[in-house]
Amino acid sequence: MFAQIRAAIRKIPRGKVATYGDVAYAAGFPGAARQVVWALQGSGGLLPWQRVLGAGGKILLPGVKGAEQRFLLQSEGVNFIGLRVDMKQHRYAWPLRRKKERKLRKRTSRR
């Protein structure tokens, strides 16, 4: 499980972000946002951890680590609206996820 989560995190490019839930979904474990946190904690800082945020683009890390995350994201060109990342502009969507969403939209539009 952690290998798939770490692989999904590595795919997030500079200037893009994803929520813990997005990463869990992309790794094939919908609803496993907490496991994404555990995978990040056990990574030894080798992953682009700053690109993973709380729901709605909120930095959840307190104090200095939260400030560091914001600084790193801003240095990658990520824009903030108040305390949150502009998710409309910077949210990363894995190609497979987009395909699944298109299929879901087609199914729901027929009804």
Segment roles from a protein language model:
Residues 1-111:
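Nucleic acid-binding interface residues in structured DNA/RNA-binding domains
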